[in-house]
Amino acid sequence: MALDIKKIEYYNITVEGQVGEGSKLLSVFADVGVNLLAFKAVALESMRTQFTLFPDDGLKMTDGAKKAGLNLDGPHAALLIKGDNDESGALADIYEKLSQADIHVNESSGIADIKGSYGVILYLEQEDCEKAVAALEM
């Protein structure tokens, strides 16, 4: 199982208000040249959404947020993993290796593409990132 593994950071921010607030938020970062590796948006309650943003450049993101008067929660640690084959058991294998290294995954998200590759984001504690990379590269 060949994996491409990248340590990344993520930030959380909650937006409230009317329809279109998410678009305004994402535009703030697009306008300063932030490229998002991934994102997640989850409704917390009516008209309140938490965005989890995974920038390729955390400094650009924090600078853009500061200029726009936005308060980001983060940075937090994560791993972005790309696999070439979404065969049955690929995710189980990743979790097994992390379990054997005594690494707790706080949260994860994944997706497969139509060509058979997949991606997964593992939300980890900062102190577990290097250990997780080592465990997965074995």
Task: Set out the residue ranges of the language-model regions.
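A conserved regulatory-domain signal marking ACT and ACT-like small-molecule sensing domains
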Residues: 1-138
